[in-house]
Amino acid sequence: MVCVNVELKERRYPIYIGENLLTDTGVYPVKMGDKVMIVSNPTVAQYYLTPVTETLEKLGCQVSHVLLPDGEKYKTLDSLNMIFTALLKENHGRDTTLIALGGGVIGDVTGYAAASYQRGIRFIQIPTTLLAQVDSSVGGKTAVNHELGKNMIGAFYQPCTVIIDTRTLVTLPKREVNAGLAEVIKYGAILDLPFFEWLEAHIDNLVALNQQDLQYCIARCCQIKADVVARDETEKGDRALLNLGHTFGHAIETHLGYGNWLHGEAVAAGSMMAAVLSEKLGDLSYSEVARLEKLLARANLPTVSPDTMQAEDYLPHMMRDKKVLAGKLRLVLLKTLGQAYVASDTDKSLVLDAIRVCSQNN
């Protein structure tokens, strides 16, 4: 087992990474209160709700659960209200702990519920998808979607513990594993060239769910994100760099309808658009763009825009991105592999050109 600590100004919390941790009583916080509510979905619950419940009961907790519909299209205020209703019906108070058992949707909605219920209660992240394990479960971003934009309603609210059991990936569909690798590759591309090079050598093992490589990879991603969050918890500076490909990717998700492309798939295509734009601006070299494209392709990820989208479809969605300031588009781009920056007010004609290069319709 590996433990990565997220060091914040006023407190810290651990991220435990290893095999068979769901049933390890030693990784659960001592201070959970007597009542715990697990939030999950039917897909995850069939595998992991019982072992987690039994482990919590061994710790003396009174455990209940609520199951939300499965999928990005259910990351909504309605799902949030389902959690609130369950908490209120069972008379849960401020001493209750919420546990998010699932992927990024479950983690984001549960975290926002914890931030809001009675003005804040404890919550634990138990991410069961690779994308959630390396990204969304760490750092305290919680949110639900709106029909006009992704993650537009939310809060920064940190978990008290993150428990990452790499064995949960065995039951994950291959498409979901691949989608998680988009966020993994992102970390190397923006901040860690040696890690990017390690991924070039080990990506096939990760696709095959080699446990040793998975644990190293997840721990490295969590450490990179923990370091960034420690410097910039509420995304006023460096944390924005973690959004490589996301402005383009969120446009894809919103335009197609949530869930048609997985988040990681949209981020992969968006990362290629950002890389091509970086090359057009004279930063990234052609060979570096090709390296990124090859690595994404080896992870079975898309590197081009959906065939149903035109370049002009992107900008209306992109202008609603949370990084937009004073009406100016801000994009995460690459100086070189391993070094990212935030570009402000980039020429929109160049943005459109980059999208067209990455289009199936060009």
Swiss-Prot record:
Catalyzes the conversion of 3-deoxy-D-arabino-heptulosonate 7-phosphate (DAHP) to dehydroquinate (DHQ). Binds 1 divalent metal cation per subunit. Can use either Co(2+) or Zn(2+). This is 3-dehydroquinate synthase. Its EC number is 4.2.3.4. SUPFAM superfamilies: Dehydroquinate synthase-like. Pathway: Metabolic intermediate biosynthesis; chorismate biosynthesis; chorismate from D-erythrose 4-phosphate and phosphoenolpyruvate: step 2/7. Belongs to the sugar phosphate cyclases superfamily. Dehydroquinate synthase family. It is found in: Cytoplasm. GO terms for molecular function: 3-dehydroquinate synthase activity; metal ion binding; nucleotide binding. Its main location: cytoplasm. InterPro entries: Dehydroquinate_synthase, DHQ_synth_AroB, DHQ_synth_fam, DHQS/DOIS_N, DHQS_C. The keyword Zinc applies. NCBIfam families: aroB (TIGR01357). GO terms for cellular component: cytoplasm. The keyword Nucleotide-binding applies. Keywords: Amino-acid biosynthesis, Aromatic amino acid biosynthesis, Cobalt, Cytoplasm, Lyase, Metal-binding, NAD, Nucleotide-binding, Zinc.
